[in-house]
Curated annotation (Swiss-Prot):
Domain ABC transporter: 5-242
Keywords recorded for this protein, A-Z: ATP-binding, Cell inner membrane, Cell membrane, Membrane, Nucleotide-binding, Translocase, Transport
Function: Part of the ABC transporter complex HmuTUV involved in hemin import. Responsible for energy coupling to the transport system.
Name of the protein: Hemin import ATP-binding protein HmuV
CDD domains assigned to the protein according to its UniProt record, in alphabetical order: ABC_Iron-Siderophores_B12_Hemin
Gene Ontology molecular-function annotations: ATP binding; ATP hydrolysis activity
Upper taxonomic lineage: Bacteria, Pseudomonadati, Pseudomonadota, Alphaproteobacteria, Hyphomicrobiales
Gene Ontology CC: one annotated term: plasma membrane
InterPro entries for this protein: AAA+_ATPase, ABC_transporter-like_ATP-bd, P-loop_NTPase
Quaternary data: The complex is composed of two ATP-binding proteins (HmuV), two transmembrane proteins (HmuU) and a solute-binding protein (HmuT).
Signal sequence residues: none
């Protein structure tokens, strides 16, 4: 696999504060990368640099061996799609109209099958004629996810598999739809799309990601396969809380929901 996306000592500073400090990553085509870390660790800032929305103060970000900021807006939009954590829509568009926006200026006739497939994928086919403001927050998030799937599909027809960036995509979703969304992202990765997602649920990250990137205070704390990253010592240090990391029968790590009592620590580490 070729290096699809690369950050080289990428740093972002504003107002004298360094939000992301000298982060280097090499991401292959078709990988699913989960970015995790506590609040204020620099996750969204890093994602925006990788997307081309923010230009690094120092260092570089390259998409397919080319500086990401050198792409013209339309060309960049055809190669990467980003689902932001909060999307504000001022007008009462229908779900169908929102999803169609992912096709840009392409004709409806040329993109209708992509729109239909995306609505079906997110479970909103029966909601396509509903006004977006009448939907719940989670349903609106799913509509915007369908929009970026259409954007990816249109770009793939021109350039091949692209880049999907997700900023806390599950924050407003119930458990079932959290699993559905991340499963869809994983399926995109298996089909060649490079996926980078900020996730707060470490169990989701461990279950679906090929690699987990951990940020702490703007710096890279860890980068590797889930079973190497989701370890008691790292989780305790980065998140400043004691949680019990266990291994499932298939070798995937998972974190128990309850905090570990201090007198259980010796047994846990044994």
């Amino acid at each position: 696999m070729s290096c699809f996306l690369e950050a080289e000592a990428a740093t972002y500073s504003v107002g004298g504060a360094t939000l992301v400090d000298r982060i280097s990553l090499r991401i292959e085509g078709g990988e699913l990368i989960a970015i995790v870390g506590p609040n204020g660790a620099g996750k969204s800032t890093l994602l925006r640099m990788l997307s081309g929305d923010l230009r690094p103060s120092r260092g570089a970000v390259r998409l397919q061996q080319r500086a990401v900021h050198s792409y013209a807006p339309r060309e960049l939009a055809s190669r990467r799609a980003m689902l932001s954590q909060h999307v504000s829509v001022s007008f009462p568009f229908t779900v169908d109209e929102i999803v169609q926006m992912g096709a840009g200026d392409r004709s409806r006739a040329a993109t209708q099958s992509l729109v239909d497939a995306a609505l079906h994928e997110v479970g909103l086919a029966e909601f396509r004629d509903r006004k977006l403001p009448t939907l719940s927050g989670g349903e609106q998030q799913r509509a915007h996810f369908a929009r970026v799937l259409v954007q990816l599909g249109c770009g793939e027809a021109e350039h091949g598999p692209g880049l999907l960036l997700l900023d806390e995509p599950t924050s407003s979703l119930d458990l079932r739809h959290q699993l559905d969304l991340v499963s869809t992202a994983a399926r995109c990765a298996r089909n060649g799309t490079t996926v980078i997602a900020i996730l707060h649920d470490l169990n989701l990250a461990a279950r679906f990601a090929d690699r987990i990137v951990v940020l702490h205070q703007g710096a890279l704390a860890a980068d590797g396969p889930p079973d190497q990253v989701i370890q008691n010592s790292l989780i305790n240090r980065v998140f400043d809380i004691e949680l019990a990391v266990r291994m499932a029968d298939d070798g995937a790590p998972f974190i128990l929901p309850q905090m570990v009592k201090s007198d259980d620590s010796a047994n846990r580490m044994a």
